[in-house]
Amino acid sequence: MFYVVRSGCAWRLLPSDFGPWQTVYGCFRRWSQDWTWTFIHDTLRDYVRKTEERKVAPTAAIIDSQSVKVPDQAGERGYDAGKKVSGRKRHLAVDCLGLILAIMITPAAVQDRDAAKGLIKVLVSLYGRLQVIWADGGYLGALVQWVKQLRPFGKLRLEIVRRCDQTKGFKVLPKRWIVERTFGWLYKSRRLRSDYEVRLDHSEAMIRICMIRLMLKRLAKAS
């Protein structure tokens, strides 16, 4: 699995040393459907947080999206007019270490604010200690008030990290750089430079496999 994600090779081109490609793909598909990849990913994330002397349940998250191209043979897609990309969007929520808390894959035409509601609902259901979510200006508007209503008697807020209108070129923004770094980690895996998967759940699984590999390397260095 790591070889496919890191090298970007097609399943049928998997070296014979790894066994029949049908067997490997069958395992990947089965683990995608029964949430095994999610379980492994989340377990490793908890271990990494502990090694960094963090509590398992985060109190803060950062959300953002990334539009990626989809080859002609792949499935569902849309057109992101802002980025001028025909493909899909990866919506991520990460903790302050850049580790993924939640993933959502949509056609690229879906607005960030619309997808964010589903992503934030997942965060709220999984992480009861969550207090603040940081996002960029693309999430500004009614979403801020909507987040407050999710926990009317609790402390949960959406904070928009604004970019100065007078700033030209690239500038590192507080908090937002964390999720951008996570997207950079994903880009190092050739399989994730575009979205080659027909099924959306397979797209999510590929992202989790990439992060599993990175977290295993991180834990190995810490041991």
Q: Where does each model-flagged region fall?
A:
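Short alpha-helical elements
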Residues: 1-223
